[in-house]
Each structure stands twice: as C-alpha cells, then as structure tokens.
C-alpha cells in the first residue's frame, strides 16, 4: 500500500492548499466590497473635476495655462498603476502589455518615454524589461491616500513644467463590473477637451475668475491631475481584489477537481491491493 499512502498524502496536501485558497477568496471578497465603496465614493469628485477641466480646455481664457497648450510630442510620460501583490490572474500582465504596445509605437516615431510606476509589480516589471523609471511608489495598502501620491505625481508635473515632457498619461485597470476589468490609458496633459456634446459649441466658453485666474488655475489644474491619478489607484485596487477573488475561486474549484481525481486513483489502488491480498490468501490455502 506504499502507492496508496503516497496518494493519501497528496490528497491531504491538496486539501490544505484548498483551505488556503478558500480563505483568500473570502478575504478578497470582503476587501472587494470595501474597495468598491471607496471607488464609488471618489468617482463623482473625479468625474466632476474632469468635466470642469474639459470646459476650461474649451474656454476662451484670459490666462492660458501651459497645461492647456498642445505641443509637439518629443518626450511622453506614463504614470503606470499596478498592484503590490500577485495572485490576481492576468490583471497586471494585461496592463503591461497594453502600455508596452503604446510605448513601442512612440519609440518607432523617435519619441522618448519616462515612467512613474505605482505598485511593486510595475516596479519589478519595468526594472526587468527596461524603461526609464523616474519615480516609483509602492506599499500603499488597501486604503491609499492622496497625500501618498503627491510626490510621484509631482515628479512628472515638474518634468512637464520644465518642458521635459510633452504628454502625460495615466495607465490603470478600469472597473467595469465584477467579471470585467479592462486596462486603460488616459491622457492627463495637455488637458483633453470635454467630449460632452452639450459642450461642443461654436463659441468658446468664457469665465470670470475671482480674484485672479492664474493662482486659481494653477491650483485647480494640479489638483485635477492628482485627483485623476488617485481615482486610478482606487479603481485599480477594486479591480485587484475582484481579480484575486476570481483567481482564488478558480484555484479552490481546481483543487476540488484534483482531490476527486486523486480519490478515484486512491480507491483503485486500494481495491487492487485488497484484490492482490485475497489472491495471495486463496493461493496459499490452495497450496495447503
């Protein structure tokens, strides 16, 4: 019964793994609900900020901020948001494939690329596969704050202010629903014009600023970029927990299938051993 004992040990090992993946699935489900609540709470602010900035991009402004001006793209920047932990299926690798494809297109046109990475998985990926990483941030946990992102975003904004970047994008996973999460790349700078049809007028939007347009726009536009990156981090976190829950459920189900298969093999091995013992007993009795 040496073979049967080995199979029994394998069954015990798989059952232990199944308990772990089941626990991780339940933890991910709990975290997913909390992260979805955080995402939904911050989304109205981010959406409203995006709409206001879209109006400004269409506006006839007294003070023309550099973030509103289009210029030839000679160097572009990406803020890439990933997870800190693995075991979340293809969430990160699909994101990296998308940004790498776009980076390849820029490179073929002779455009240089700078990267700011958020999340240890993005840091490890671009350190291994190449990329000019100028800022990195990780260990934000399950409750990231805007203050933790200001430094990373500030590095890219400074480079843009100094003319070292001509485009700035944010890359993260978008939460569609619990079954669908899609990698997305959105332009932050120069400010994209509003896509709202109601805003597409033949005349330019005009605003009166109090007290002065320059300090107001300077603060507002920086806060816009920070809010979009923060929303990207929160949304990516929700995607991470959903993907991990699904991956752990699949692992738990697969473990159950393996246990069933091993149990069948064990039963057959045990049956064969019993049959052999009976045959030996019968043969011995016949010899007597």
Curated annotation (Swiss-Prot):
A single GO molecular-function term is: proton-transporting ATP synthase activity, rotational mechanism
Q: How does it sit in the membrane?
A: Peripheral membrane protein
GO annotations of cellular component type: plasma membrane; proton-transporting ATP synthase complex
Top-level taxon in the UniProt lineage:
Bacteria
Per UniProt, the keywords (alphabetical) are:
ATP synthesis, Cell inner membrane, Cell membrane, CF(1), Hydrogen ion transport, Ion transport, Membrane, Transport
Q: What is its main location?
A: membrane
Q: What are its GO biological-process terms?
A: proton motive force-driven plasma membrane ATP synthesis
Check the record and name the Gene3D superfamilies matching this protein.
Answer: 3.40.1380.10, ATP synthase, gamma subunit, helix hairpin domain (1.10.287.80)
The cellular location(s) given in this protein's UniProt record come to: Cell inner membrane
Family under the similarity heading:
Belongs to the ATPase gamma chain family.
Q: Please describe what this protein does.
A: Produces ATP from ADP in the presence of a proton gradient across the membrane. The gamma chain is believed to be important in regulating ATPase activity and the flow of protons through the CF(0) complex.
Q: Kindly state the subunit structure of this protein.
A: F-type ATPases have 2 components, CF(1) - the catalytic core - and CF(0) - the membrane proton channel. CF(1) has five subunits: alpha(3), beta(3), gamma(1), delta(1), epsilon(1). CF(0) has three main subunits: a, b and c.
**Name of the protein in question:** ATP synthase gamma chain
